[in-house]
Regions:
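Bacterial N-terminal signal peptides that target proteins for export
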Residues: 2-15
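C-terminal motif of bacterial Sec signal peptides marking the signal peptidase cleavage site
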Residues: 24-27
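Bacterial signal peptide processing site
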Residues: 29-31
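Forkhead-associated
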Residues: 65, 70-136
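An exposed acidic His-Trp-rich patch
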Residues: 119-134, 225-276
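Surface-exposed beta-loop interaction hotspot
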Residues: 142-209
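Extended, aromatic/histidine-rich regions of cofactor-dependent oxidoreductases associated
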Residues: 174-177, 248-250, 260-263, 269-271, ...
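Flexible, glycine-rich surface segments
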Residues: 187-248, 253
Length: 315
């Protein structure tokens, strides 16, 4: 009888190894990279543009902002008389509607009898007001078509006034965009700051606040690596990014543009889609307090994506 080439025990071991390889080898193969769906991306950006427009045009959107008044310590009169500290449209307010009392950073409303101010649909004549830095948001006051709340910027306290019937809102000219371009949907990586870095951010009123940056976003354009610092705002998960580029002050708004990006995935990857870059509120109103891009976020190339500067008149 011819002897087997291998002892039976050896043959069984080899067979077991082959079976294991056949099971686990496919699992070890790298999955193919997902195919980019340009049509789906276009739909995503168009939906984002639609939501952007709706948010801008809503009753309490930035188009309705008509006034910003910084308070002095003590009593601050408000009403339609031009001598008041807070001047309201005469169609919506009496000559003297009441006072806002500023007391070491705290504001109290004192309305005159018969002035129909409400908050949350309920009449109010006296109350302490929360500002827009409060965790639950500011106290919103309504007087006719006016929407009034307290804002805090650096060490200053002010009264912001919106009007649902504002001229800017009525005469809004719409938004204009660069063509949607998937090349400006860029993969970046987060280079974390340990600990997170405090970055001084100046606004259009020359006020400066320190904001928290979780790390630099590093990405490539035309073979070169660039880094920008996002901001992680209080209570938010998405990163807020302020940028300027070589279109700034030309095709796009002169103070830069903003966008939000989702936080990094488990590998540290972040998608920056410049097709979602938009103009700050001060592109539409003279009464916003827009923060400005820090110097490290000034990019030395043209980003021909996202929102162009507003063609209408700012009142």
């Amino acid at each position: 009888m011819t002897k087997p080439a291998f002892p039976s025990s050896t043959f069984r071991v080899l067979l077991s190894i082959l079976l294991l390889v056949s099971v686990f080898l496919p699992a070890c193969r790298k999955s193919p990279a997902p195919v980019f769906d340009a049509a789906a991306h276009k739909q995503e950006i168009e939906k984002w543009q639609s939501n952007r427009l709706a948010g801008l045009k809503k009753e309490d959107g930035w188009l309705s902002l008509i006034g910003l008044f910084w308070l002095d310590e003590g009593e601050n009169k408000f009403g339609s008389d031009p001598s008041n500290k807070v001047t309201l449209p005469k169609e919506q307010a009496p000559t003297l509607a009441g006072t806002f009392k500023l007391d070491h950073g705290h504001v109290r409303l004192n309305a005159r009898p018969g002035v129909a101010i409400t908050t949350g649909g309920q009449p109010v004549s006296q109350m302490d007001l929360k500002d827009d830095n409060d965790d639950s948001g500011p106290t919103i006051l309504n007087l006719g078509t006016l929407i009034i709340n307290v804002v805090k910027r650096a060490e200053r306290i002010g009264i912001r006034v919106k009007d649902t019937a504002s001229r800017t809102r009525r005469e809004f000219k719409g938004l204009d965009y660069f063509p949607i371009d998937p090349k400006w949907r860029i993969e970046a990586r987060l280079e974390p700051y340990q600990p997170p870095k405090m970055i001084p951010i100046e606004n259009v009123l020359n006020m400066t606040d320190d904001e928290t940056s979780p790390g630099a976003l590093a990405f490539e354009v035309n073979g070169k690596t660039y880094r920008i610092d996002p901001i992680l705002e209080k209570g938010e998960t998405d990163y807020f990014v302020m940028i300027a580029d070589e279109t700034t002050g030309r095709e796009t708004y002169g103070a830069g543009r903003y966008l939000y990006v989702s936080p990094p995935d488990a590998s540290g990857k972040v998608i920056i889609d410049f097709n979602k870059a938009y103009s700050p509120p001060c592109a539409f109103t003279a009464f916003a307090t827009c923060p400005l891009p820090p110097q490290q976020n000034h990019l030395p190339f043209r980003i021909e994506a996202g929102e162009k500067k507003y063609a209408g008149v700012v009142h």
